[in-house]
Amino acid sequence: MKRTWQPSKLKHARVHGFRARMATKNGRKVIKARRAKGRVRLSA
């Protein structure tokens, strides 16, 4: 059985990237929460 994590920067960005987050209401909530917490990296 192959390993479950087969990294792809493009796939990762499409699901977890900044634009993906901003595309939905809940995604914007995630960014807002991370800003409030003072995270240096807001998204992938």
Swiss-Prot record:
- The source's domain of life comes to Bacteria
* GO MF, one annotated term: structural constituent of ribosome
Q: Which Pfam families match?
A: Ribosomal_L34
PROSITE patterns, sorted? RIBOSOMAL_L34
Protein keywords: Ribonucleoprotein, Ribosomal protein
An example of a Gene Ontology cellular component annotation for this protein is: ribosome
Its GO biological process annotations read: translation
List, alphabetically, the InterPro entries matched. Answer: Ribosomal_bL34 (IPR000271), Ribosomal_bL34_CS (IPR020939)
Assigned protein family: Belongs to the bacterial ribosomal protein bL34 family.
The protein, known as: Large ribosomal subunit protein bL34
Gene that specifies this protein? rpmH
